[in-house]
Amino acid sequence: MEVGIFVNFQKERSSEILENIVSIFNQNGVNWLLVNEENKKTKNFDLLITIGGDGTLLNVVEKASKEATPVLAINCGRLGYLTEEVGDDIEKAIFNLLKKEYFIEERHIVEAKVKEKVFFALNDVCIVRNTFNIVDLCLYIDGVFAQEYRSDGIIVATATGSTAYSLSAGGPIVEPQLGVILVTPICPHSLSSRSLVLGSARTIKVENSSSENVQVVVDGRFVDELAPEEFVECKISQHNLKLIRLKQRNFYEILREKIKE
């Protein structure tokens, strides 16, 4: 078995958890490698482990989904929507992993095409202003003009991303198993501008109809700029993210705890 481990060393206890995992792997003949930005595109693994928070998991979304590699995301901080809470039972968790005593939870992701480059987002693709000026963005659904937004930007989110930036911008909460696309304007200059919830077969195009450039941000990471009349095209990907679950998790219990924070 080949295991890749991606660690956010800024998180409390991340080094301690890594040491425990590596010790168990070494004792059981498991090949492992620390994954970083330099080697994650060239190395293939049977499974991936992330140690950190939900944000740490986002670093391996593209690799894991394209290669159908299951991911065990171990939480080191506050309660996460996506990560596993193992607490002090890290040894038990890893032995259950080795014995394959787990199940797979699949999450839909968005595939975004920007100038012939393709990016993958577990949470969202954001088209946002580059300056303090508001921007004009045109939304097309399956090639049909739907609406023009004067706003600070637009969030194109998955069901998983409905509890992230989209929620802060006033978007709805959607059960993560649903293969829908959410379109949420950011601070729109119109009381009639509302979020849209679209089916999984829809293709969305967001065109920059402003006189200045806008930024494209994928899962919190800047990837490119759109000049006037350039666009980003988004759809639900044929690839899913496979999350390893060691125990049953109730979405609404997690949601209740997160909202209380």
From Swiss-Prot:
Keywords tagged on the record: ATP-binding, Cytoplasm, Kinase, NAD, NADP, Nucleotide-binding, Transferase
CC annotations in GO: cytoplasm
InterPro entries reported in the protein's UniProt record: ATP-NAD_kinase_N, ATP-NAD_kinase_PpnK-typ_C, NAD/diacylglycerol_kinase_sf, NADK
Assigned EC number: 2.7.1.23
GO biological process, one term: NAD metabolic process
Primary subcellular site in the record, as a coarse category: cytoplasm
Cofactor(s) for this UniProt protein: a divalent metal cation
MF annotations from Gene Ontology: ATP binding; metal ion binding; NAD binding; NAD+ kinase activity
Subcellular location as annotated: Cytoplasm
Active-site residues, as the UniProt record annotates them: 54 (proton acceptor)
Residues holding NAD(+): 54-55, 123-124, 150, 152, 163-168
Origin superkingdom: Bacteria
UniProt xrefs under SUPFAM superfamilies: NAD kinase/diacylglycerol kinase-like
Reactions mediated catalytically: NAD(+) + ATP = ADP + NADP(+) + H(+)
Family: Belongs to the NAD kinase family.
Role noted for this protein: Involved in the regulation of the intracellular balance of NAD and NADP, and is a key enzyme in the biosynthesis of NADP. Catalyzes specifically the phosphorylation on 2'-hydroxyl of the adenosine moiety of NAD to yield NADP.
Protein name: NAD kinase
Recorded name of the encoding gene: nadK
